[in-house]
């Protein structure tokens, strides 16, 4: 029997996958897919890895432990730091020099060198559902207008851009590895919008389908102009982003701006027709329903899948011709 997965996440360079389960946590190497580390514990609701280091951010599943974040050196098997929060930890992300922690109402930013609290972002008392971090910026949905995304500086704790993404609540947001784009999907799940982080302009709209289905994971290709998404029905759609922003190295500006791209989009039927693109390739996860994470591999034309059902899959993607993606590998996560 596969273990019941509670959390899964690839590290920043996509080389390792960390898994939290009812019985502890594991770390797997992506290529070739092999188990590197396993630890029996009282369950892990969050398990994040810092690049290829032995440092993991870890949260237990027991009710009394969900407010406690531990930084663990898994090689030496010691707890380096413990931080208590006023409410349960909802998400944790690493950058090369920052630790970012989300709880209800707040985002905490720490300096990784000394674990000094640098900034706290107030997200009000609403629920932050969509949350992503890239280098010096964090993206999260507006609790008051959940179809909007804020981009905020980790160094100043100031929102620099407000982007109108969807008419319904944003459910998933992801940064391009270079940070110049974000992709968003709403609870409806029929389209994914790709938007520049510098000025919030709409780059393209990618249509998953016309029947609503929850999109649970989005991933940009690290080099090529492709994006993949996985929905709750187990279908992976791969899109080619043929329209690229003019300045891929740009960053959000230092003052708050409100994107007008969404209003332009609504008032331009012509733009809606040519800017909506169908999938380039597809894959079918062999499960009746799916919840988990997908990611483009950094070591080849592959999509990797970690399912909360306790399974790992790897699909081949033909980046030249598209079409159906062949299932190359299947693995069951061990307890």
UniProtKB/Swiss-Prot annotation:
Keywords: Autophagy, Cytoplasm, Golgi apparatus, Membrane, Protein transport, Repeat, Sporulation, Transport, Vacuole, WD repeat. WD repeats lie at residues 165-205, 210-249. This is Autophagy-related protein 21. Disruption phenotype: Impairs atg8-processing. One of its GO terms (cellular component) is Golgi cisterna membrane. The keyword Cytoplasm applies. One of its GO terms (molecular function) is phosphatidylinositol-3,5-bisphosphate binding. Required for cytoplasm to vacuole transport (Cvt) vesicles formation and autophagy. Has a role in sporulation. Belongs to the WD repeat PROPPIN family. The gene is mug179. PANTHER family: WD-REPEAT PROTEIN INTERACTING WITH PHOSPHOINOSIDES WIPI -RELATED (PTHR11227). It is found in: Cytoplasm; Golgi apparatus, Golgi stack membrane; Vacuole membrane; Preautophagosomal structure membrane. It is a peripheral membrane protein. Its main location: cytoplasm. The keyword Membrane applies. One of its GO terms (biological process) is macroautophagy. It comes from the Eukaryota. InterPro entries: PROPPIN, WD40/YVTN_repeat-like_dom_sf, WD40_repeat_dom_sf, WD40_rpt. Transmembrane segments: none annotated. Pfam families: PROPPIN (PF21032). It comes from Schizosaccharomyces pombe (strain 972 / ATCC 24843) (Fission yeast).
């Amino acid at each position: 029997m596969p273990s019941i997965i509670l959390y899964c996440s690839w590290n920043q360079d996509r080389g390792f996958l960390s898994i939290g389960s009812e019985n502890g946590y594991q770390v797997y190497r992506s290529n070739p897919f092999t188990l590197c580390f396993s630890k029996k514990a009282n369950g892990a609701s969050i398990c994040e890895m810092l690049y290829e280091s032995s440092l993991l951010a870890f949260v237990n599943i027991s009710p009394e432990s969900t407010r406690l974040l531990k930084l663990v050196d898994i090689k030496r098997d010691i707890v380096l730091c413990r931080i208590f929060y006023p409410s349960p930890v909802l998400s944790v992300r690493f950058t090369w020099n920052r630790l970012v922690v989300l709880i209800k109402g707040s985002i905490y930013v720490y300096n990784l060198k000394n674990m000094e609290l640098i900034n706290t972002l107030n997200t009000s008392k609403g629920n932050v559902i969509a949350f992503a971090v890239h280098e010096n910026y964090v993206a999260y949905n507006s609790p008051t207008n959940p179809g909007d995304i804020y981009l905020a500086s980790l160094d100043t704790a100031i929102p620099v851009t407000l982007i109108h993404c969807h008419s319904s609540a944003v459910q998933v947001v992801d940064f391009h590895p270079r940070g110049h784009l974000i992709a968003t999907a709403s609870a409806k799940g029929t389209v994914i919008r790709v938007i520049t982080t510098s000025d919030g302009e709409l780059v393209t709209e990618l249509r998953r389908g016309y029947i609503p289905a929850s999109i649970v994971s989005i991933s940009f290709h690290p080099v090529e102009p492709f994006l993949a998404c996985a929905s709750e029905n187990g279908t992976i759609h791969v899109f080619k982003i043929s329209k690229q922003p003019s300045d891929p190295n740009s960053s959000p500006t230092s003052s708050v701006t409100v994107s007008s791209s969404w209003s332009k989009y609504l008032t331009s039927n012509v733009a809606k027709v040519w800017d909506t693109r169908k999938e380039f390739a597809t894959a079918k996860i062999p499960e009746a329903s799916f919840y988990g994470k997908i990611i483009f591999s950094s070591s080849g034309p592959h999509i990797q899948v970690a399912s909360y059902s306790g399974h790992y899959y790897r699909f081949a993607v033909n980046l030249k011709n598209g079409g159906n993606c062949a299932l190359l590998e299947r693995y069951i996560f061990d307890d």
